[in-house]
Amino acid sequence: MEVNGVSQSEAAPYVTKSSVKFRDNFWGSEDAGMDALMSRTKSSLSVLESIDEFYAKRASIEREYASKLQELAASSADIPEVGSTLNNILSMRTETGSMAKAHEEVSQQINTELRNKIREYIDQTEQQKVVAANAIEELYQKKTALEIDLSEKKDAYEYSCNKLNSYMRQTKKMTGRELDKYNLKIRQAALAVKKMDAEYRETNELLLTVTREWIDRWTEVCDAFQHIEEYRLEFLKTNMWAYANIISTACVKDDESCEKIRLTLENTNIDEDITQMIQNEGTGTTIPPLPEFNDYFKENGLNYDIDQLISKAPSYPYSSSRPSASASLASSPTRSAFRPKTSETVSSEVVSSPPTSPLHSPVKPVSNEQVEQVTEVELSIPVPSIQEAESQKPVLTGSSMRRPSVTSPTFEVAARPLTSMDVRSSHNAETEVQAIPAATDISPEVKEGKNSENAITKDNDDIILSSQLQPTATGSRSSRLSFSRHGHGSQTSLGSIKRKSIMERMGRPTSPFMGSSFSNMGSRSTSPTKEGFASNQHATGASVQSDELEDIDPRANVVLNVGPNMLSVGEAPVESTSKEEDKDVPDPIANAMAELSSSMRRRQSTSVDDEAPVSLSKTSSSTRLNGLGYHSRNTSIASDIDGVPKKSTLGAPPAAHTSAQMQRMSNSFASQTKQVFGEQRTENSARESLRHSRSNMSRSPSPMLSRRSSTLRPSFERSASSLSVRQSDVVSPAPSTRARGQSVSGQQRPSSSMSLYGEYNKSQPQLSMQRSVSPNPLGPNRRSSSVLQSQKSTSSNTSNRNNGGYSGSRPSSEMGHRYGSMSGRSMRQVSQRSTSRARSPEPTNRNSVQSKNVDPRATFTAEGEPILGYVIALYDYQAQIPEEISFQKGDTLMVLRTQEDGWWDGEIINVPNSKRGLFPSNFVQTV
């Protein structure tokens, strides 16, 4: 019998060995046994695959282990041993190499003997499974089809029978023609029942035959699957046995290698190894002699009693501890190095000490008891030895710091009253222990004072010579600690200088409000009362500067580099520096107190139109702040609107552009366009819209004009009210105005406001500006430089002479507002005062003045494009791209279009072959 071309004997040539048979246990309804055996065959194959993967990983481990053992055995480190110990170490290395080879063989055997056999068995089992499944698959499908057909025919047969039965029941109630009709239906139903009965019987017989064949074939398939399962289990047993043998072989080889190592170790001879090591490394048997004490005096025949010499030496009191801050100040090299100070010197220093504030009080006289106490304290300072004096002579003579005489009280630190700057300097000196390196240049004052210094130091020769046998360890230590604080220590102290910023090294505050340049930092004085102190400080300024290159403070004003354009932001124009503020560091707490007091003063004020009270309040407040040692620039913090103080960040940089400002700027540009094409546009409206767009722009972070605007603020605030009141008046400038200012202030007031508002003065020369009392008048040298710079600024702005009084004051205010140093609150105060004056009973005069000073420039270009306004260049600018234009300082440009990013579109006027292009708005000033 053949099924699918495979004979029954070939399909099931299996003989089972187990007493339990699959044929007796895999039956059931709907052939459930067949599904169980098929799933078992699949799972058995997956087990074989997992074992093959296990062998692969073990072979990889053995191969890696063998490789590492081989590297360990092949290490070529030198062995400083001899004899049997060397043989033992070499044997261990050799046997380790043998173990590596054994494990390499284990890896190869696992791959060849175990894994290959598993792959072969998997292939063979799959073939047997396919043969057994094919032998029963067709019969299984035929049996399933007959079962379905038999079920359908059975249903049809039962339906026909039920129909015939219903007809027969209905005929009992019918007669006549209706009975004849039902008899016809009964006949047809009987024929259908007969037909369905024949088909049902035939299908049943066929299914019976197929089922019997299926039983026989399934029995054979069960035997085949049982044979496959028995063989698989036997194969796994054999394969894993071989695995154990292979691993055991490797272990045996490892044990053999270990046994060889043990045999080598048994041959170790320690005596021979020691003997051979001595022969190779021995250095001799002679013991070196013991050290002996050699008495210098006995060897040279000298008979000195050291104890007696020590008792004869004079002893001076000296301190072995670290000198305090006062002792360090007293022993500063700015005093005489080796002489005690007399009472006359101390008294002269105390009496001639300069005041530390502009509003100083007279110095109280010092009594003789206080002078004696100071002299006693200074005489208790330890006197350095002659060796120290000799070692410190080059330092003192090479330094540019001169020794102050009796007539120079500004350098006497001990007698001068301490200020806040002194306290901070002393605190920094004690905490950081900084050393100031000596400068290379020597001032003329030092050269002139050499002879006097030599004469003064001769008084101390006896004391110095008498102390030459005194131990100098403690004295040199205290002297080092004293001099290291002032920059006159040894080379090692100079190497430990802490790096400081430029502003700190120059002794200047690093606040962004102090925008002075480096060139004028040491030469400018605060007031005429402090000019002597400033000149002396400038003489010693070079000595406190370090020769080494140090990092530039990020807040220092040095140079603004825009492409090839180098702008000296540290050197502000001279006209804005005629009013120099105090050089003390602005205290944040003082700024906050000034802001609070100013805001309370604003709330108490009843009207902004009262000119005299406002001017007097500002003058008195600035006077009080200057009296307390604060800067006049701090008054910008107290500037507010309608009594509401503006939030201050106390020295923080200005904020960047905000989206609201950009939106307002865009709206202003749109309204300008509508005004140009929707209604008649005048020159004044174009200029006002341009100024409005400039005022809405955020302040530039450039610190160029920080000091100029801060110095301008006090004079601007004092003259703002009088300026707004007298705009409509036409008065010729009389000398009496200047005489009044001189009689009140004592000397002519600097013309910083006049130089910055040159356009206003040029357009209306008849306008008089009433000056208030200056709290800190400047010296003649400062005033002359301001006048010269005012003339220079006036000549550079000749194109602005016809702008009117009110517009003439706008450029400088906008310039200060744009560069961020001059507070916007001060400008809003001026605008409020100007607005209040505009509502005064004299509007006709002001309008008449402005109408007379209308700029004759065109408001439209030749192509009909509207001109937004005119600007004047503050700096030189070199174009970086073809779309930009270059200009020089003083050039006048027309503005045709503005952008939110600060770049404006325009053209230089009164220049042949000029082209249109972009230029930066922070390089120009609105005319």
From Swiss-Prot:
One of its GO terms (molecular function) is cytoskeletal protein-membrane anchor activity. SMART domains: FCH, SH3. The keyword Transmembrane helix does not apply. Residues 321-354, 695-714, 784-813 have a biased composition (Low complexity). Keywords: Cell cycle, Cell division, Coiled coil, Cytoplasm, Cytoskeleton, Mitosis, Phosphoprotein, SH3 domain. After the onset of mitosis, forms a ring-like structure which colocalizes with the medial actin ring. Appears to mediate cytoskeletal rearrangements required for cytokinesis. Essential for viability. This is Cell division control protein 15. The lineage of its organism: Eukaryota, Fungi, Dikarya, Ascomycota, Taphrinomycotina.
